[in-house]
């Protein structure tokens, strides 16, 4: 990975349950450790983990050349509202922008919805008479006298941090910078954040929220970094402390202290970098990065060995994992979807008798019931303990001793009893005659509790599969032909099931999977993405203006990177574009070299091509807009050595087995157990099997096999299924996608998924689990329809207020499932309009691919400008 002359380096990832520490030795191999996260003082777990790993390796801290840190401190401060006392100064007339929000509602069916409160209360928001226009012109001169009055009130108000956000400052920052000058004259020690520096992008709601968030956490992060650096120096560290930012690059501690909002979502970024590295090593050009830890599961797409990036994301959601319920942050980030599906995610049965998993988590304290640290809630980890995937003898995380009894008690109380499961009616098939070879102190085969555990596992698997499908659609991608990289403590337990559900050929489980994000930190380049909104259209393109913006962004990004390294750098440029009238942009890469009139002309063609890739068709004759520009400068990373795929050999004979519930068989079966440390390149393990190591366990499902690759990565695929690219390895190791396309939404059927028919296994109550999974998948299908409509809409009410609905109906016109995104009022009109189509045309006359459309209010569309479209499938 690096020249062997380099010294050891350390990566530290603070998660919701565990703090992971990875040490890279000079030869490029890794040592690692997990310690429980200390939420009140996160540096305690960081320092304890570093001390433990260097002591075990016999390395003095002063020999370590880099310490790279990803922290949730900024995220937690925003969630828990425990940042600095902060004021917002904005343009007169725009005091309430962060409170009035947008028209979007994250829960359309909640009449008593409580919108997230603004980060800064109204009494702490001040205004200055001034106004910059959308093209940077001064519409109202900056009122110095009024500004000095605001400064005096800020000084007297006891604030420790100030956010400044004036209208259109991304085009002309003079007024914001002048206010900072006045404030520093009066209070030099007061922290100040300017929106023109933190997030120079259009859309004032998002920009103002971003600068408020930066100001709110700035004193906290600056203090934390000072304390951590001081303690590291006291321990003997002589190297710099570097931070990973949400865009997946490294930044100096000084830069992080100035722009701490860029640290939000820094941990998950490390995981995506880790997956991208594996893509290079194993010559896979398209990867699904699957990171499942103790609290959440994160899914990202890797293309051409690089993670996809976005310009905005949400944090501090009040309705966790519901889009629109949080605070928008407009800074570059690795694009991913995050759901409450971790090992510590809590399972329960709702009022409808359905198993729900997450988003609440048992966290590190008290943790899952099986940790025997006082937790009583049933979790995904407890389910894996009960069905035999996790075993006390091979669970080495942080020295925790698993209690199978506590896991069983929690599952029975939270899931089994509410569903009416009992040993007398359960039909899991405990296979009581099967014996283990050697002592087995795992969970006994209790059919009722097994049924509860299998139900929890099935639901969390389906939740993650639906999240992956949704993320792919939002990105305009089809997962056919992708591979998966699974890491995080819980991902290897669920990866086999996930690739089967998604129609993915294979999953790679790398060495160090349990601490993948921390290793990813050590693979990250110094990087910074500078962004700015600058409006240009295909009708009147300002080439010189764009050229100037790109030069300024390049200089800004290079300056930040040079704060941390003198290495050679690369530059990438991108613009967000749309059709005039739309409100959602797609990214278009810019060519290298000077931006001139020829490049401007080529930009239109590049946008049309990108739009067709996203949505299937372009729209002729419309004006195209370029709205936001970005330049990313990164240090050059060493190209890793690739490995050739290892062929499968004869499956190894198991040294030991234990009874583990097999979802395909619907019962417990003798399952081979292998210690990963004993496996060598070329070894083949046939499922059902478990491959154990200190920080995770890999499940090789029945009908699958794992082959150990040259770098000791496990490649798992269905038995006899070659990787799509192995038959034809094209030049440049681009994969040959020759296998048949699969439906991304194939539904469970009696012939296709016997495991889903039997996996709940116990009585009428547990037979509802596969029906619940099928319904969830239908919801995922129509949610994709709704999201695509929002993204392509020219109607403000559709894209901002969700003035739409999407659903699936049976032959008689009864709705089976509807999208979460949408307006309740359209549901009934949609059903009535469909009834009109059925009555007028007849179901037997309809054919797949037909399209029926009406805007007739008398056929229940509601208004002339409302349209109902139906397509038979």
Put a short name on every predicted segment.
Residues 206-217, 261:
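Glycine-rich tight-turn/loop motif centered on a GG-T
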Residues 4-6, 14, 145-149, 153, ...:
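C-terminal, non-catalytic interaction/recognition modules in large multi-subunit enzymes and RNPs
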Residues 24, 33-40, 87-93, 113-115, ...:
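Glycine-rich phosphate-binding loop of actin/hexokinase-like ATP-binding domains
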């Amino acid at each position: 990975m690096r020249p062997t002359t380099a010294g050891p380096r350390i990566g530290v990832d603070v998660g919701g349950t565990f703090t992971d520490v990875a040490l890279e030795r000079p030869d490029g191999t890794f040592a690692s450790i997990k310690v429980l996260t200390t939420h009140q003082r996160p540096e305690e777990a960081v320092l304890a983990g570093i001390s433990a790993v260097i002591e075990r390796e016999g390395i003095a801290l002063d020999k370590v050349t880099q310490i790279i840190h990803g922290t949730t401190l900024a995220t937690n401060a925003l969630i828990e509202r425990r940042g600095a006392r902060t004021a917002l100064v904005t343009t007169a007339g725009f005091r309430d922008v962060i409170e009035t929000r947008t028209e979007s509602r994250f829960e359309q069916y909640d009449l008593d919805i409580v919108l997230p409160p603004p980060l800064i209360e109204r009494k702490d928001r001040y205004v200055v008479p001034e106004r910059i226009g959308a093209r940077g012109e001064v519409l109202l001169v900056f009122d110095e006298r009024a500004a000095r009055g605001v400064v005096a009130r800020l000084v007297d108000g006891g604030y420790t941090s100030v956010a400044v956000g004036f209208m259109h400052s991304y085009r002309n920052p003079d007024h914001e910078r002048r206010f900072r000058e006045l404030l520093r004259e009066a209070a030099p020690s007061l922290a100040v954040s300017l929106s023109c520096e933190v997030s120079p992008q259009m859309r004032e709601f998002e920009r103002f929220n971003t600068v408020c968030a930066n100001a709110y956490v700035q004193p906290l992060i600056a203090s934390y970094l000072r304390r951590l650096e001081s303690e590291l120096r006291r321990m003997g560290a002589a190297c710099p402390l570097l931070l990973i930012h949400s865009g997946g690059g490294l930044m100096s501690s000084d830069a992080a202290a100035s722009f701490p909002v860029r640290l939000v979502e820094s941990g998950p970024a490390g995981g995506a970098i880790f997956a991208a590295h594996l893509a290079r090593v194993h010559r896979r050009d398209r990867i699904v990065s699957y990171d499942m830890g103790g609290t959440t599961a994160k899914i990202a797409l890797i293309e051409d060995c690089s993670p996809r990036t976005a310009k905005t994301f949400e944090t501090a959601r009040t309705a966790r994992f519901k889009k629109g319920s949080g605070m928008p942050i407009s800074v570059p980030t690795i694009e991913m979807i995050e759901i409450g599906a971790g090992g510590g995610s809590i399972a329960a049965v709702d009022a409808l008798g359905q198993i729900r998993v997450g988003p609440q988590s048992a966290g590190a304290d008290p943790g899952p019931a099986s940790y025997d640290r006082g937790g009583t809630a049933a979790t995904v980890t407890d389910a894996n303990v009960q069905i035999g995937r996790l075993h006390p003898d091979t669970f080495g995380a942080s020295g925790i001793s698993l209690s199978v009894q506590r896991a069983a008690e929690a599952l029975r109380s939270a899931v089994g009893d509410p569903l009416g499961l009992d040993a007398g009616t359960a039909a899991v098939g405990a296979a009581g005659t099967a014996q283990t070879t050697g002592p087995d102190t795992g969970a006994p085969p209790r059919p009722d509790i097994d049924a509860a555990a299998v139900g929890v596992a099935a639901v969390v698997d389906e939740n993650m599969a639906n999240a992956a499908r949704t993320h792919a659609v939002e990105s305009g991608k089809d997962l056919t032909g992708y591979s998966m990289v699974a890491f995080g403590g819980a991902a290897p337990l669920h990866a086999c099931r996930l690739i089967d559900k998604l129609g993915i050929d294979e999953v790679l489980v790398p060495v160090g999977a349990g601490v993948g994000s921390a290793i990813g930190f050590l693979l990250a380049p110094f990087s910074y993405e500078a962004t700015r909104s600058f409006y240009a259209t295909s009708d009147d393109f300002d080439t010189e203006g764009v050229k100037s913006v790109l030069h300024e962004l390049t200089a800004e990004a290079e300056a930040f990177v040079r704060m941390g390294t003198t290495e050679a750098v690369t530059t990438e440029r991108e613009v967000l574009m749309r059709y005039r009238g739309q409100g959602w942009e797609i990214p278009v890469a810019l060519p290298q070299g000077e931006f001139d009139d020829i490049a401007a002309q080529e930009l239109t063609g590049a946008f049309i091509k990108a739009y067709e890739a996203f949505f299937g068709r372009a729209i002729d004759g419309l004006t195209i807009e370029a709205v936001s520009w970005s330049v990313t400068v990164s240090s050059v990373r060493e190209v890793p050595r690739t490995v050739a795929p290892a062929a499968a050999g004869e499956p190894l004979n198991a040294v030991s087995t234990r009874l583990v519930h097999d979802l395909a068989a619907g019962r417990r079966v003798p399952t081979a157990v292998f210690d990963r440390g004993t496996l060598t390149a070329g070894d083949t393990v046939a499922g059902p099997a478990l491959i154990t190591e200190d920080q995770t366990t890999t499940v090789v499902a029945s009908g699958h096999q794992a082959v150990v690759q040259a770098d000791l990565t496990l490649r798992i695929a269905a038995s006899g299924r070659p990787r799509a690219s192995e038959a034809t390895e094209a030049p440049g190791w681009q994969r040959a996608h020759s296998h048949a396309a699969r439906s991304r939404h194939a539904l469970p059927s009696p012939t296709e998924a016997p495991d889903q028919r039997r996996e709940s296994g116990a009585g009428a109550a547990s037979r509802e689990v596969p029906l619940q999974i099928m319904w969830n998948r239908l919801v995922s299908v129509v949610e994709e329809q709704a999201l695509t409509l929002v993204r392509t809409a020219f109607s403000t009410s559709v894209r901002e207020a969700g003035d739409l609905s999407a659903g699936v109906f049976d032959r008689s016109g009864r709705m089976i499932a509807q999208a979460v995104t949408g307006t309740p009022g359209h549901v009934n009109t949609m059903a009535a309009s469909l009834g009109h189509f059925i009555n007028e045309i007849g179901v037997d006359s309809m054919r797949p691919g037909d399209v029926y459309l009406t805007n007739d209010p008398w056929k229940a569309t509601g208004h002339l400008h409302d349209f109902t479209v139906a397509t038979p499938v």
